[in-house]
Amino acid sequence: MPREFSRSDRVSAQMQREIAEFLRTGIDAPELGMVTVSDVDVSRDLAVAKVFVTFLGARLETRAAVKRLGEFAPQLRQVLGRRMRMRIIPEIRFAYDDSLERGLHMDEVLRSLNKDGDL
């Protein structure tokens, strides 16, 4: 019977849980506000993990907040190395997840079209 999820999918899910826990308890960076890990995309060869995050109440501009978060990547890899059963922990790259903003923009466009009677 084939597996339902690939290894990279399982690693992504576990990394998402572990990274969220680390960001909640393992860093002291109040300027980032509340950081939410929305997704982790791990490459097929498990060499790179792209961590998508959102910020609530951040005092920094988005790019600066992502850069600041990247400063914690080496420490995070060490923590993941202790918590996960993997020979090699993927390189961690943070990226801002703008899907919520894009969704809100699409909603505004649809509402304006509907209001104008174009829909």
Swiss-Prot record:
<dbReference type="GO" id="GO:0043024">
    <property type="term" value="F:ribosomal small subunit binding"/>
</dbReference>
<keyword id="KW-0690">Ribosome biogenesis</keyword>
<dbReference type="GO" id="GO:0030490">
    <property type="term" value="P:maturation of SSU-rRNA"/>
</dbReference>
<dbReference type="InterPro" id="IPR015946">
    <property type="entry name" value="KH_dom-like_a/b"/>
</dbReference>
<keyword id="KW-0963">Cytoplasm</keyword>
<dbReference type="GO" id="GO:0005829">
    <property type="term" value="C:cytosol"/>
</dbReference>
<dbReference type="InterPro" id="IPR023799">
    <property type="entry name" value="RbfA_dom_sf"/>
</dbReference>
<dbReference type="Pfam" id="PF02033">
    <property type="entry name" value="RBFA"/>
</dbReference>
<comment type="function">
    <text>One of several proteins that assist in the late maturation steps of the functional core of the 30S ribosomal subunit. Associates with free 30S ribosomal subunits (but not with 30S subunits that are part of 70S ribosomes or polysomes). Required for efficient processing of 16S rRNA. May interact with the 5'-terminal helix region of 16S rRNA.</text>
</comment>
<dbReference type="InterPro" id="IPR000238">
    <property type="entry name" value="RbfA"/>
</dbReference>
<protein>
    <recommendedName>
        <fullName>Ribosome-binding factor A</fullName>
    </recommendedName>
</protein>
<comment type="similarity">
    <text>Belongs to the RbfA family.</text>
</comment>
<dbReference type="InterPro" id="IPR020053">
    <property type="entry name" value="Ribosome-bd_factorA_CS"/>
</dbReference>
<comment type="subunit">
    <text>Monomer. Binds 30S ribosomal subunits, but not 50S ribosomal subunits or 70S ribosomes.</text>
</comment>
